């Protein structure tokens, strides 16, 4: 799922432009929930729509409010440092990455216990 604070049309357009929409069953926007980030509602809504308990979810976040929302939802957070977001307070993260490199993707896969040979 994608659970973003951005308006739904922006999320959808971005995913379609990057040809990524086909990889996500659920796209949830902060404007679709009563309390957007840093409240947990966006993540809880995405998990509910997926039919997945929050203890089986993981969040990859690049904003302080998103990290706070993940913590409030009791979902582990992988922190993706975004140099374009200014000085962000890094939330309690189970893993930190600084770029979408092969090495960092492998770190995430290892953390999630994915067998990369089967992916």
Which residues does each PLM region occupy?
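Conserved phosphate-coupling serine/threonine residues in phosphotransfer and NTP-handling enzymes
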Residues: 4-6
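Asp-based, Mg2+/Mn2+-dependent phosphohydrolase catalytic module
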Residues: 8, 12-119
